[in-house]
Amino acid sequence: MDKLQNIRGVAFDLDGTLVDSAPGLAAAVDMALYALELPVAGEERVITWIGNGADVLMERALTWAREERATLRKTMGKPPVDEDIPAEEQVRILRKLFDRYYGEVAEEGTFLFPHVADTLGALNASGLSLGLVTNKPTPFVAPLLESLDIAKYFSVVIGGDDVQNKKPHPEPLLLVASRLGMMPEQMLFVGDSRNDIQAAKAAGCPSVGLTYGYNYGEAIALSEPDVIYDSFNDLLPALGLPHSDNQEIKND
């Protein structure tokens, strides 16, 4: 398609795009909830909360856990719990616990999606500049990329603490494009969620939406990315590079 003709660089989201981080995130969320004597959520539910950074993840987890506890107590005929700690303070405590537990389980609970490593290698070898934009707290990003052996492919990495405004705000994408030395329209952004596509549109970047990510249980097509792919390595032929499998473009 025309928007991919003059691409000089590619930037990627992390969670749900390059890596399946749900097992580690869910484990850390549940350990934090358990430490506060709140119901645990489980991976299937936590997946629907991923995408807006750790603070929002904690807010969603706490809101659900308090409602779930109230429902369970009502079912058992028990009186509601008198919340002596304000929700804002509980979120702060939960975030502190989450950070500690996630630091322990992040690497063992995160896995590359199929074709990610070889596709990043091919893109890098072609001369394209690569960047990473994630809402994940910055201290977790570099160690995770190193443990997965993909840090070497990225010239610029922007974590959630590196900007004032996280995705879907365009700020992190504009920052990456600037540091890569190109205009936003020359940088393709690849993600799995509506936050990614909204950020790309606001920044003026062409976008690819991947169908296998998290995206709050919604189809990525609803966000209207420029192109939709089922497999990560479908990026290669779209950018004029060899690809042994048949790519399937869902829309133009």
Curated annotation (Swiss-Prot):
**Biological process (GO), any one:** carbohydrate metabolic process
Q: Active-site residues?
A: D13
- Ubl conjugation as a keyword of this entry, yes or no, is no
Q: Where does Mg(2+) bind?
A: D13, D15, D192
Protein keywords: Carbohydrate metabolism, Chloride, Hydrolase, Magnesium, Metal-binding
Stated EC number for the protein is 3.1.3.18
Known cofactor(s):
Mg(2+); chloride
Q: In which pathway does it act?
A: Organic acid metabolism; glycolate biosynthesis; glycolate from 2-phosphoglycolate: step 1/1
Q: Which GO terms label this protein's molecular function in UniProt? A: metal ion binding; phosphoglycolate phosphatase activity
InterPro entries, per this entry? Answer: HAD-like_hydrolase_sf, HAD-like_sf, HAD-SF_hydro_IA, HAD_2, HAD_sf, PGP-like_dom2, PGPase_prok
Top-level taxon of origin: Bacteria
GO CC, any one term: cytosol
Q: Top EC class per UniProt?
A: hydrolase
Tell me one Pfam family matched here: HAD_2
Which transformation does this protein catalyse, written as a reaction? 2-phosphoglycolate + H2O = glycolate + phosphate
Q: What does this protein do?
A: Specifically catalyzes the dephosphorylation of 2-phosphoglycolate. Is involved in the dissimilation of the intracellular 2-phosphoglycolate formed during the DNA repair of 3'-phosphoglycolate ends, a major class of DNA lesions induced by oxidative stress.
Q: Which family does it belong to?
A: Belongs to the HAD-like hydrolase superfamily. CbbY/CbbZ/Gph/YieH family.
**PANTHER family in the cross-refs:** PHOSPHOGLYCOLATE PHOSPHATASE
What does the subunit comment say?
A: Monomer.
Protein name per UniProt: Phosphoglycolate phosphatase
